Amino acid sequence: MGENDPPAAEAPFSFRSLFGLDDLKISPVAPDGDAVAAQILSLLPLKFFPIIVIGIIALILALAIGLGIHFDCSGKYRCHSSFKCIELTARCDGVSDCKNAEDEYRCVRVSGQRAALQVFTAAAWRTMCSDDWKSHYAKIACAQLGFPSYVSSDHLRVDALEEQFQGDFVSINHLLSDDKVTALHHSVYMREGCTSGHVVTLKCSACGTRTGYSPRIVGGNMSSLTQWPWQVSLQFQGYHLCGGSIITPLWIVTAAHCVYDLYHPKSWTVQVGLVSLMDSPVPSHLVEKIIYHSKYKPKRLGNDIALMKLSEPLTFDETIQPICLPNSEENFPDGKLCWTSGWGATEDGGDASPVLNHAAVPLISNKICNHRDVYGGIISPSMLCAGYLKGGVDSCQGDSGGPLVCQERRLWKLVGATSFGIGCAEVNKPGVYTRITSFLDWIHEQLERDLKT
């Protein structure tokens, strides 16, 4: 076929063509039953018809059974890049079993309210004892989370941990020389308990602090310059399109729907350390690459998360600071008062705000948010709702991708990224956010992969 030839179109499958019925020439005058039977018999002997039908049913059943076995990964790990299932013991074992070696990433995490260090080994997450722990191991752990440096590691009594982190333990193998410890999950042995009675806590980033006052936004208030120092404006071809949150000097978290089909990095710039979008003296930062979640589909709402990597690292000051990511399995209770911010419209259908606004919004349980009078069952576990069922305060158009933050132990944490809603500040239609704890593995994998390149 030449370059100018039209592409060949495949004929659509139909059961009529399978049985040869499309070849029948039906007269506009209804024929008698014997005539139709004669025509069918001339094309397909009736004695073969039951055999073919049974064969098709058997094929469908075989496929269904095969797919059922194929998709059933109970007690196993499913490779995200394919439908392959591997044993849990094969994850983080030093051998790549999945495409792109995904089973050898996300082998370290920081968990719970107290940031306990855990590694995945021998088919389970296990908490790191402080026995034989050395401070330089913390840098290795943070690198496995995608951070190029670390702030501190400390010791915490085992009984101060949440119960789910007190069952399985590991310690660094003290027989290994320091130069042999290159990945924590390859350098540990299992323990029933910690001899020291303490576990390791880890902090990889100096984040979640600010010097501004803590008291879109429909029903919101204008923000001060240092109040939300992690807030950024994502600008497409020079115009504010979405918000985002700084998590490291190089990385911004935003929503996938902001960048889907607009993922050419050179079309984007990022502005930081500003309140007003008008006559702003702050420089624009170029974007090196954009990654959105591979399972994001525009019409399905879920997996609405993306990362932007800047071409050059940010320099932090009182107006530019990273927000902390939450810890794995860290819970934020329903009703907790959190904050959303952005340059979105201050009324439904209005223009984007020229100044950064913020508003306090309580977290709403998914059970309430899925009520038939609210969102009617479309809110998945990887989403969360925040706002007021009575309306009046909400994120709005232009706030997409921006932060929903909560304060825990004097640190501000990124709990959600603004995703969608119906209208702005309407009754029974609170804002819907991407739940960041559901995507920590994905975020850390992208950061770790990039750090290794």
UniProtKB/Swiss-Prot annotation:
Broadest EC class assigned to this enzyme: hydrolase
E.C. number: 3.4.21.-
GO cellular component term, pick one: endoplasmic reticulum
UniProt GO molecular function: serine-type endopeptidase activity; sodium channel regulator activity
Active site: 257, 304, 400
Domain SRCR: 104-205
Record's function text: Probable serine protease that plays a role in hearing. Acts as a permissive factor for cochlear hair cell survival and activation at the onset of hearing and is required for saccular hair cell survival. Activates ENaC (in vitro).
Protein's name in the database: Transmembrane protease serine 3
Species of the source: Mus musculus (Mouse)
Gene behind this protein: Tmprss3
